[in-house]
Amino acid sequence: MSDTILGFNKSNVVLAAGIAGAAFLGYCIYFDHKRINAPDYKDKIRQKRRAQAGAGGMAPRRPAAAGNDAAPDVTDPSQMQRFFLQEVQLGEELMAAGNVDEGAVHIANAVMLCGESQQLLSIFQQTLSEDQFRAVVQQLPSTRERLAEMFGAKADEAENEPPMVQYLGDGPPPAQIQELIDDTDDLE
């Protein structure tokens, strides 16, 4: 049996195949790096995730300003905490997608629900752009009335109870807030 393949030396064919494989692998790595470092990559990922979530049977989330029929029970701390975290996350997602006004509404809701509003505002001042933070601050005056409408009489009953989420400013923020910060840092 001959050591040639189609007239080429077998070792040369193996060498050529190895070089072609390495070149293809380098090509893949180069374009993957270029794709990931593209300025609009993270926006495309967010849009793709939203499209998949929408196609997966999840109902689109309605803004709280439009009247949320499924307002959490203000006497249940776990529901309020879940609602608080949802408002923060939804607000940041909307702002990242370019919908600053609607995102500001949700973040203002979270700020008003938080027991330590000033500390939370200082966190948002550090993490949001100046325009986004200004939009949140402008939403704060109308947020109290909006939340009163959303929660109705239950808010009056729970007003004398301690806040559901507190951050005293000493040390790191609560784990839930830190998780949100870490999650959004991954997307930046």
UniProtKB/Swiss-Prot annotation:
Molecular function (GO) terms listed?
mitochondrion targeting sequence binding
Q: Which residues lie on this side of the membrane: Mitochondrial intermembrane?
A: 1-12
Q: Which segments does the topology annotation call Cytoplasmic? A: 32-188
| Main subcellular location | mitochondrion
Question: Which InterPro entries does UniProt cross-reference here?
Answer: MAS20, MAS20_rcpt_metazoan, Tom20_dom_sf
**Annotated segments matching region Disordered:** 42-73, 156-188
Null mutant phenotype reads: RNAi-mediated knockdown results in impaired mitochondrial homeostasis with the up-regulation of the mitochondrial unfolded protein chaperone hsp-6 and impaired daf-28/insulin secretion.
Membrane-spanning residues where? 13-31
Bilayer disposition of the protein: Single-pass membrane protein
Complexes and interactors: Forms part of the preprotein translocase complex of the outer mitochondrial membrane (TOM complex).
User: Any idea what this protein is called?
Assistant: Mitochondrial import receptor subunit TOM20 homolog
Organism, per UniProt?
Answer: Caenorhabditis elegans
